[in-house]
Amino acid sequence: MKEELHNLDILDASFPCSVFSIAGDRQKAWGKEKVFREGQKAQRLDDLAFYSIALAKELQPKVVVFENVQGLLQGEAIEYVKEIYSQMDNAGYILQHWLLNARNMGVPQNRPRVFFLGLRKDLCKPFMVQKDLFERVPKIDMDFNEKEIVLDEFSDYNGRQIPKGVMKYWEHRNEKDNSIGDIVKRMDNRLSMFNNMFLKKDKVCNTISAMEDRLLYFDNPSYISAHDTILASTFPMDYDFNGMKPWFACGMCVPPVMMANVAARIWDCWLSKIKKEECA
């Protein structure tokens, strides 16, 4: 590999989240290959984290960042987390993780995500603090308390009209309903369409999905607009998604402002001090 790659400050090596999402029977996807629409060859997704760790072990950046869905911390998936910790330790890093939510980080979207931060062991000494009775870790402040931004502060409420099959339920909504599924259960006494969530004016936008028809406005019979999808994900309105629909692109990514907040904390708490020491 090129020499400059062996002198990285941060390696962001996040891995695909679909196999760790709590939506659906995720265990069925473990150990199986998947083809992406972007054109990559068929590959397993549940072990890509370990290829990322192998890359970190080779390049030895100062800091390694992984991001994934909160489902990674639940159920049988926790075994992956244990293995990630073990392999990162072997790669020469002290690893920590936090469950963060974009809504507290200047992003107008409810998007909980797990962030793993690893600091190279030879750089840790000045930052070490006692985490608990048994563990010492490099200190970093990962508390975020930005004011929440509700839907009505930015929405144009101008998405694609919902179809008649959805409209017949939407017309019977009440303030307590959080999804079309709540109405289906009340009217038809069956479980369906709970993934079709309502967006309410005075609430933070729900998690953006890779599919347009997962979110619809409570006060307007339409799905979330491209305009709102882009702004709720903190992309510029003129961003080039390279032919992808904004719902898919935004649903598959970390909001840039969320990532910028994490990077700023890494700089403030670790890298700025390391750089200062290197220049002394």
Regions found by a protein language model. Name each.
Residues 11-14, 52, 64, 116, ...:
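Conserved small-residue
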Residues 15-16, 61, 108, 236, ...:
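Proline-centered helix-kink/hinge sites
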Residues 14, 103, 119, 209-211, ...:
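Structured loops at beta-to-helix junctions and adjacent beta-edge loops in soluble globular domains
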Residues 2-8, 18-198:
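Class I S-adenosyl-L-methionine
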Residues 159-280:
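C-terminal target-recognition/interaction regions appended to catalytic cores
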